[in-house]
Amino acid sequence: MVICKEIDYYLKYAEEHPNWINKKRKLMLKNIVKPLLKRDDVFFDEKTYRNCIKYCESNYYKLFPFQKFIYAFAFMYKDDIPVFPKFFIKEGRGNGKDGFIVPLVNFFQTPLYGVKNYHVEIVANSEDQVKDTFKVAYDLSLIHISE
């Protein structure tokens, strides 16, 4: 059984604000998230997840509850294999996609994650969008190096 206070918080939020949660997200919570949390064969690497949250919030900014909710699923495993090896996140213009993904993938590239030479791929609608995301990550890394 997976226990994560950030997931519980988001599930409670969704139940208390049903008009703010779209139909597809409600279906995802009902048919994927809640059954997954009840499984005994899924391991949640809470230590690495907590390190991720701490790393992101100390090197970038305070994360929103929905970010912590989604990030948690990157640390769930069945037989040492990620339950969700790929994530597809669909967000509109100006919603902060770079701010969502850059801290997480940057964490994956640190020794705190524990995987040497971790490979990250970012897919976008255009080469310029991918370059923008890379530039955000690169510029932030320069800031941290100079500190």
Predicted regions and their residues:
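Phosphate/NTP-binding elements of NTP-utilizing enzymes
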Residues: 1-146
